[in-house]
Amino acid sequence: MKDSLPAFEKAKVLVVGDVMLDRYWTGPTGRISPEAPVPVVRINQLEDRPGGAANVALNIATLGGQVSLAGIVGEDETAAALTTGIQALGVEPKWHVVADKPTITKLRVMSRSQQLIRLDFEEPYQQADSQALLDSAANSLADVDVVILSDYAKGALIEPLAFIQQAKSQGVKVLVDPKGSDFSKYRGATLLTPNLHEFELVAGAVTSEADLVEKAHKLLEEFDLEALLVTRSEQGMTLITAENKELHIPTVAREVHDVTGAGDTVISALATSLAAGSTMAEACAIANTAAGIVVAKLGTSTVSRIELIESLSDTHHSETGFGVVTEDQLMYALEQTRLRGERVVMTNGCFDILHAGHVSYLQEAQAQGDRLIVAVNDDDSVRRLKGDGRPVNPVGRRMAVLAGLASVDWVLPFSEDTPQRVIARLLPDLLVKGGDYKIEDIAGGKEVIAAGGLVKILCFEDGISTTKIIENIMANQ
């Protein structure tokens, strides 16, 4: 697969929010303390990882984007460790220092890949601290394409409305990872990325897909938002826009070890992609893939460009369902294919006994675009068209042979006499047919043309047909 990711190195992003340090103390445990019924952990590994808004910034830097980070820290050893950690990966710190408060720290004690306890070191920040941070961050708006507000309700983003309006007035997109049940503080933002629980806290319980979309549109209007991206764990994520467009993206996670920082990964990949020129739909697909990678890791983690490319390639070759597919599987595969900007070609036929003419025709069809769909008449459909004694090969075998050709990406059956319904649903960019047809007589052609696609006639190789092959076999018996 080609590297279809945008030029992340061109992305310029400012992250503003609650920064913290995630500390991991790890070691074996083999006995219970005589002082209390708790395990004794013999610590042999210490690790610091930037967390919260700092993890968002690290994700952007790891993807290759240019990123600066504005947050509140104390005047302490933890702040120094946090600064060292982000600068080492190319993140520019823009701290507001509050000397009488500790830098927020989450200390986790680990053993055998399990978290035994978490200790939090923090004190809430005041309105004056938050305002000073936002005023300082506003000075960087002219240098960026996208701003992320990473809200963990620790006090960095108490009243960000004026900052959002200032960013939007300068043409800067504002993405928000929200916290709590009050979305009014984010009014006017470009996009919010609540998880389903956060969404329901504001909109009420979701009873169906249609209900989710309806509730989302109400929030878009109420809070003057351009879009909502609702992350839904194993159900993937759903994008709803003020332009009445909805896109559901299924999850791509293979294994889930730790959801720590998954929301950070989603919004960082989304922002980096948008800043690099991706559409909203493209950026959401990339963010979904990034989230699937990070939940397979233990602890707060980042995702690299190489990991994204490899994961997108794996998804492209498996979960999008190459080979023999159902219509629903193919609809999702096409959604992902079009996000990558690939041209889809479609043809159809009985393909009862695959011969050299078929092979050359399918090769020519595939050469017209990037991906080729072959719709195949099922057995009853062939029988109605060709008469008793046909098909020679049942539909399962015919599709298996077609799917084995290098020129064919997807094969699916249809039961009608013509594939018009299937073509009208799939709407390829190019519909091709072999033989002496007129374009206006090709099933599904009108629907494809009406949708902005093309219809093309290709030539079959002379002197080769399934009927002649069958006649020759019968004559030689």
Curated annotation (Swiss-Prot):
Sorted alphabetically, which InterPro entries does this protein's record hold?
A: Bifunc_HldE, Carboh/pur_kinase_PfkB_CS, Cyt_trans-like, PfkB_dom, RfaE_dom_I, RfaE_dom_II, Ribokinase-like, Rossmann-like_a/b/a_fold
Give any Pfam family that matches.
CTP_transf_like
Which key words tag this protein in UniProt?
Answer: ATP-binding, Carbohydrate metabolism, Kinase, Multifunctional enzyme, Nucleotide-binding, Nucleotidyltransferase, Transferase
- GO molecular function list: ATP binding; heptose 7-phosphate kinase activity; heptose-1-phosphate adenylyltransferase activity; phosphotransferase activity, alcohol group as acceptor
User: Which reaction does this chain catalyze?
Assistant: D-glycero-beta-D-manno-heptose 7-phosphate + ATP = D-glycero-beta-D-manno-heptose 1,7-bisphosphate + ADP + H(+); D-glycero-beta-D-manno-heptose 1-phosphate + ATP + H(+) = ADP-D-glycero-beta-D-manno-heptose + diphosphate
For this protein, what is the EC number?
2.7.1.167, 2.7.7.70
Catalytic residues, chain numbering:
264
Could you name the domain of life of the organism this protein comes from?
Bacteria
Q: Positions of the region Cytidylyltransferase?
A: 346-477
Q: Which GO terms describe its cellular component?
A: cytosol
Q: List the disulfide bonds.
A: none
Which residues of the sequence carry a binding annotation for ATP?
Answer: 195-198
Recorded metabolic or biological pathway in which this protein acts: Nucleotide-sugar biosynthesis; ADP-L-glycero-beta-D-manno-heptose biosynthesis; ADP-L-glycero-beta-D-manno-heptose from D-glycero-beta-D-manno-heptose 7-phosphate: step 1/4; Nucleotide-sugar biosynthesis; ADP-L-glycero-beta-D-manno-heptose biosynthesis; ADP-L-glycero-beta-D-manno-heptose from D-glycero-beta-D-manno-heptose 7-phosphate: step 3/4
**Which example biological process does GO assign this protein?**
ADP-L-glycero-beta-D-manno-heptose biosynthetic process
Give the span(s) annotated as Ribokinase. 1-320
Q: What is the documented function of this protein?
A: Catalyzes the ADP transfer from ATP to D-glycero-beta-D-manno-heptose 1-phosphate, yielding ADP-D-glycero-beta-D-manno-heptose.
Q: How does it assemble?
A: Homodimer.
Entry's PANTHER family?
BIFUNCTIONAL PROTEIN HLDE
The text of the family note is: In the N-terminal section; belongs to the carbohydrate kinase PfkB family. In the C-terminal section; belongs to the cytidylyltransferase family.
What's the name of the protein? Answer: Bifunctional protein HldE
The species this protein was found in: Shewanella piezotolerans (strain WP3 / JCM 13877)
Gene name of this polypeptide: hldE
